[in-house]
């Protein structure tokens, strides 16, 4: 029975980190294929009788933080994307004689309250490069 385990690995920045994770996961028993998508920070392991906990533990042993892939609706990254049937939605500008071009399904994006307001203020941006902040950016 072939299984797929999808993991989110934040801060997956360079090709060296990706190859290190690929080699680490290919050493696990049962892993046949490892796919690393750096732009989405996603690692997919496919194989025979894979256990999510063992794959997570192997990634963490390689020195990376890891969690199970939080977007369970296929490979869609739009977790806040909703579809409603046409009888639920309001037709503000529709004419009664026209047919519904959407096929009866209306979609929209729901923006969570956390992202609808600017989060970073001037103080936070200024303290990113401060010498007093131990977690500051090391570019300077």
UniProtKB/Swiss-Prot annotation:
<feature type="modified residue" description="Cysteine methyl ester">
    <location>
        <position position="137"/>
    </location>
</feature>
<keyword id="KW-0479">Metal-binding</keyword>
<feature type="domain" description="HMA">
    <location>
        <begin position="3"/>
        <end position="67"/>
    </location>
</feature>
<dbReference type="GO" id="GO:0046872">
    <property type="term" value="F:metal ion binding"/>
</dbReference>
<keyword id="KW-0449">Lipoprotein</keyword>
<feature type="propeptide" description="Removed in mature form">
    <location>
        <begin position="138"/>
        <end position="140"/>
    </location>
</feature>
<keyword id="KW-0636">Prenylation</keyword>
<comment type="function">
    <text>Heavy-metal-binding protein.</text>
</comment>
<dbReference type="InterPro" id="IPR006121">
    <property type="entry name" value="HMA_dom"/>
</dbReference>
<protein>
    <recommendedName>
        <fullName>Heavy metal-associated isoprenylated plant protein 31</fullName>
    </recommendedName>
</protein>
<feature type="binding site">
    <location>
        <position position="17"/>
    </location>
    <ligand>
        <name>a metal cation</name>
    </ligand>
</feature>
<feature type="lipid moiety-binding region" description="S-farnesyl cysteine">
    <location>
        <position position="137"/>
    </location>
</feature>
<feature type="binding site">
    <location>
        <position position="14"/>
    </location>
    <ligand>
        <name>a metal cation</name>
    </ligand>
</feature>
<comment type="similarity">
    <text>Belongs to the HIPP family.</text>
</comment>
<keyword id="KW-0488">Methylation</keyword>
<dbReference type="InterPro" id="IPR036163">
    <property type="entry name" value="HMA_dom_sf"/>
</dbReference>
<dbReference type="Pfam" id="PF00403">
    <property type="entry name" value="HMA"/>
</dbReference>
């Amino acid at each position: 029975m072939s299984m797929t385990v999808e993991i989110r690995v934040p801060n997956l920045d360079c090709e060296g980190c990706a190859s290190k994770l690929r080699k680490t996961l290919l050493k696990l028993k049962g892993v046949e294929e490892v796919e690393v998508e750096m732009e989405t920070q996603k690692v997919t392991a496919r194989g025979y009788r894979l256990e999510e906990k063992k794959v997570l533990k192997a990634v963490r042993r390689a020195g990376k933080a890891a969690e199970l892939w939080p977007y369970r609706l296929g490979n869609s990254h739009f977790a806040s994307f909703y579809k409603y049937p046409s009888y639920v939605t309001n037709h503000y500008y529709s004419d009664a004689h026209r047919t519904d071009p959407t096929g009866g399904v209306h979609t929209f994006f729901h923006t969570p309250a956390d992202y609808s307001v600017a989060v970073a203020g001037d103080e936070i941006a200024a303290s990113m490069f401060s010498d007093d902040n131990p977690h500051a950016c090391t570019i300077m």
